[in-house]
């Protein structure tokens, strides 16, 4: 039995995690893959959100248009960007996009968010975006405050250092109540990402090297959350073929196969898809 199947029997959910580059830089292709994944028993389909990537990647698809296509091609799987760098987005636009996509999908959206990085092709510096990590962290937190308020359906009055929303009501609301689940990405051993993660519905640790690292982060987040705590998700990205069972035992609730963006191909993704989670 594969490690993937063992983990699924332990209760770990599995989602395709598609870098929308080159072979996958086509919303029709991504939507077909999502439909195949749903038919094969996968629990989610998430996509990378970038405007460019370093060589040899040449083609990049828009994450949000692709997610709309995925929503139309599926009925059951969770879907969303994993992750979208909120600091390079306008929060009021994201408020409209998330509510619309959640309604389009019948309440299946999960919003993955993070700081973003300039290391993978200069997509921040080459487009005039903020490159200071500290400032992007502030913009991320402020954007999340605006989104949470917008999803409530009440008028939003926000006057912050980076954004202003002066008495706007964002209707219709998302299908999910009280709003779209948010998973925040960050380094597992850093204090600020863990505190941010504890305020929302899930954590997506990056650059994990072993399961013990994850266990420490899970314990830290648990200590920061209110009690009794509502359900919480921990998602891990691991290379295809890696046994995710130790990570499930450390607290992971979702496993995402992490494809190499420089070499990912449609055939490789379909191969992983066909090896999908075992039936419980």
Task: Mark where each language-model region is.
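Active-site-adjacent structural elements that line small-molecule/cofactor binding pockets in enzymes
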Residues: 1-280
């Amino acid at each position: 039995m594969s490690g993937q199947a063992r983990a699924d029997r332990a209760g770990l959910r599995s989602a395709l995690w598609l870098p929308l580059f080159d072979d996958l830089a086509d919303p029709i292709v991504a939507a077909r893959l999502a439909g195949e994944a749903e038919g094969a028993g996968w629990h989610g389909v998430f996509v990378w959100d970038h405007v460019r990537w370093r060589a040899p990647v040449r083609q990049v698809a828009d994450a949000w248009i692709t997610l709309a296509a995925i929503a139309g091609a599926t009925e059951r799987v969770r879907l969303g960007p994993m992750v979208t760098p909120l600091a390079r987005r306008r929060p009021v636009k994201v408020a409209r996009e998330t509510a619309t996509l959640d309604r389009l999908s019948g309440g299946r959206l999960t919003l993955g968010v993070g700081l973003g990085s300039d290391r993978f092709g200069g997509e921040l510096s080459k487009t005039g975006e903020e490159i200071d990590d500290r400032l992007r962290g502030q913009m991320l937190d402020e954007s999340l405050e605006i989104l949470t308020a917008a999803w409530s359906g009440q008028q939003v009055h926000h006057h912050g250092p980076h954004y202003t929303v002066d008495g706007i009501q964002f209707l219709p609301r998302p299908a999910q109540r009280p709003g779209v689940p948010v998973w925040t990405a960050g380094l597992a051993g850093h204090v600020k990402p863990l505190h941010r993660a504890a305020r929302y519905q899930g954590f997506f640790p990056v650059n994990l090297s072993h399961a013990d690292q994850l266990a420490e982060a899970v314990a830290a987040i648990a200590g920061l959350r209110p009690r009794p705590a509502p359900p919480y998700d921990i998602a891990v990205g691991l290379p295809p073929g890696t046994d995710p069972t130790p990570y499930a035992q450390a607290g992971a609730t979702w496993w995402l196969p992490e494809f190499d963006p420089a070499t990912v191909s449609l055939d490789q993704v379909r191969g992983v898809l066909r090896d999908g989670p075992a039936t419980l």
